[in-house]
């Protein structure tokens, strides 16, 4: 597969933010999203989309002190995953960098260089997962697809 990568800074870019993922996902493909959590943030989300479906939904919720992961197929959400190896990895008012690595069986997610979870693929046609969406209570500063 192609190792095409874009590294584009987006200073003070308004969210929601959408961009295409060239060639879709494949094992070893990584995506990086960096920004600053707003000081009054309730939640934000990073979605990897496949048409109208959401293959991977990463949703830090400050009002619940949780990082929810899920998949939405045909407008129906699956079971939420919430377990983390440590405390909430995001803080209001602080910078963050999320690294999502696509593997053959799962997504591996790291925040600020620390692994926080694996999420098994529920939508299996990885090349069709070709859109990144970032929305919610953050200032987006950098995206690499």
UniProtKB/Swiss-Prot annotation:
Annotated residues that bind a beta-D-galactoside are located at 77-83
The modified positions for N-acetylserine read 2
Q: Cross-referenced InterPro entries, in alphabetical order?
A: ConA-like_dom_sf (IPR013320), Galectin-like (IPR044156), Galectin_CRD (IPR001079)
Give one GO term, molecular function aspect. carbohydrate binding
Q: Does the keyword Protein biosynthesis apply?
A: no
Highest rank taxon of the organism: Eukaryota
Q: Which residues form a coiled coil?
A: none
Tell me which GO cellular component terms the UniProt record holds.
cytosol; nucleus
- Tell me if Acetylation is a UniProt keyword of this record: yes
The record's keywords, sorted A to Z, are: Acetylation, Lectin
- What residue stretches are annotated with the Galectin domain? 17-145
Task: Summarize tissue expression.
Answer: Erythrocytes.
Pfam families from the xrefs?
Answer: Gal-bind_lectin
GO BP terms in the entry: negative regulation of CD4-positive, alpha-beta T cell proliferation; negative regulation of type II interferon production; positive regulation of gene expression; positive regulation of T cell apoptotic process
Assembly, in brief, is: Monomer.
What role is this protein assigned? Answer: May function in erythrocyte differentiation.
Protein's name according to its UniProt entry: Galectin-5
- Originating gene: Lgals5
């Amino acid at each position: 597969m192609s190792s095409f990568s874009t590294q584009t800074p987006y200073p003070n870019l308004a969210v929601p933010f959408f961009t295409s993922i060239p060639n879709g996902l494949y094992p070893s493909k990584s995506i990086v999203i960096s920004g600053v959590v707003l000081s009054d943030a309730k939640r934000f989300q990073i979605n990897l989309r496949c048409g109208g479906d959401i293959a991977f939904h990463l949703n830090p919720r400050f009002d619940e002190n949780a990082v929810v992961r899920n998949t939405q197929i045909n407008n129906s959400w699956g079971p939420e995953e919430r377990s983390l190896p440590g405390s909430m990895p995001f803080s209001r008012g602080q910078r963050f960098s999320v690294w999502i690595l696509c593997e053959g069986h799962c997504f591996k997610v790291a925040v600020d260089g620390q692994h926080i979870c694996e999420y098994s693929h529920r939508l299996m046609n990885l090349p069709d997962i070709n859109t990144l969406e970032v929305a919610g209570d953050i200032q987006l500063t950098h995206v690499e697809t």
